[in-house]
Amino acid sequence: MDIKSFEKIQLYGFNNLTKTLSFNIYDICYAKAPEQSKAYIAYIDEQYNAERLTKILSNVADITGANILSISKQDYDPQGASVTMLVAEEMTVPTLTPESLTGESPGPLPGNKPSPGSIVTHLDKSHVTVHTYPETHPLDGISTFRADIDVSTCGHISPIKALNYLIHSFESDIVTIDYRVRGFTRDINGQKYFIDHDINSIQNYIAKDILNLYHAIDVNVYQENIFHTKMTLKDFKLNNYLFGVSEEELSDHESASIKDQLRDEMQEIFYGRNVTKV
């Protein structure tokens, strides 16, 4: 479905649209022994601690042209971390969102921040949050790490331009992405706009070199301004999923069994349902 292109239209008051990006990544691992599972959880917990997550979210704010107002961060015991940022937009004249902030193309990596004008308003409904969830299966050696990132903005800022950077920031076997636009804004003649930028697919905001690594499917509800994409890695190399052991140290039977376990785990996560064992 093609959505009409938006010309720059002068708005009445501020842009009141709320745009929300939900980004969920999964890293899957197999550890042969319980102590190796514990070591993986400790490793991944340290890799994505609150300090590093704060840097990632700061770059998200930078890419979207937002101004950070406050930061709250916390590491949890025994594992996990969370960071919440309150951000404000940096724009001058209230118009429909500039192409550079929402154009249907991959967003920049850190260092290419859109040029802001003077700050005219603090929008307290704009925020960025991340939570991490390391966990391990009690019996079969499978461990997973999940990170949930939510970027909700009110005004010109669109979080979708940060998507390309977020995918680069995490080692992701599976990625689930949701984007939605809510509310409406008016032009100076009183006409409502329920979305202020072109979008046909979330995939158009992801660089081709990244997309080529994944199988990706879309489920979009255009009339409701709801867009959904999920991706799973194409290339399966067992050594990339082993922690504390290499494939060369395993018997052929062990390798085959672990591959089956990992593929089942990834399939269940990707489709969001348990696989029936035959």
Curated annotation (Swiss-Prot):
Active site residues of this protein: S126, H131, C154
Q: Which residues form a coiled coil?
A: none
Q: Give the record's cofactor note, including how many are bound.
A: Binds 1 pyruvoyl group covalently per subunit.
**Which reaction is catalysed here?**
S-adenosyl-L-methionine + H(+) = S-adenosyl 3-(methylsulfanyl)propylamine + CO2
> According to UniProt, where does the site described as Cleavage (non-hydrolytic) lie?
K125, S126
Q: Which GO terms describe its cellular component?
A: cytosol
What are the UniProt keywords, alphabetically?
Autocatalytic cleavage, Decarboxylase, Lyase, Polyamine biosynthesis, Pyruvate, S-adenosyl-L-methionine, Schiff base, Spermidine biosynthesis, Zymogen
User: One Pfam match, by short name?
Assistant: AdoMet_dc
Keyword Lyase assigned to the entry: answer is yes
Gene3D superfamilies in the record:
S-adenosylmethionine decarboxylase
Query: Which residue ranges are recorded for the region named Disordered?
Result: 96-115
Residues with the modification Pyruvic acid (Ser), per the entry, are S126
PTM comment, free text: Is synthesized initially as an inactive proenzyme. Formation of the active enzyme involves a self-maturation process in which the active site pyruvoyl group is generated from an internal serine residue via an autocatalytic post-translational modification. Two non-identical subunits are generated from the proenzyme in this reaction, and the pyruvate is formed at the N-terminus of the alpha chain, which is derived from the carboxyl end of the proenzyme.
Q: In which pathway does this enzyme or protein participate?
A: Amine and polyamine biosynthesis; S-adenosylmethioninamine biosynthesis; S-adenosylmethioninamine from S-adenosyl-L-methionine: step 1/1
Question: Biological process (GO) annotations?
Answer: spermidine biosynthetic process
State any single GO MF term: adenosylmethionine decarboxylase activity
This entry's Enzyme Commission designation comes to: 4.1.1.50
Query: Is Phosphoprotein given among the entry's keywords?
Result: no
The cofactors named for this UniProt entry are: pyruvate
Q: Which family, according to the similarity comment?
A: Belongs to the prokaryotic AdoMetDC family. Type 2 subfamily.
What does this chain do? Catalyzes the decarboxylation of S-adenosylmethionine to S-adenosylmethioninamine (dcAdoMet), the propylamine donor required for the synthesis of the polyamines spermine and spermidine from the diamine putrescine.
Q: How does it assemble?
A: Heterooctamer of four alpha and four beta chains arranged as a tetramer of alpha/beta heterodimers.
The name under which this protein is listed is S-adenosylmethionine decarboxylase proenzyme
Q: Which organism is it from?
A: Alkaliphilus metalliredigens (strain QYMF)
Q: Which gene encodes it?
A: speD
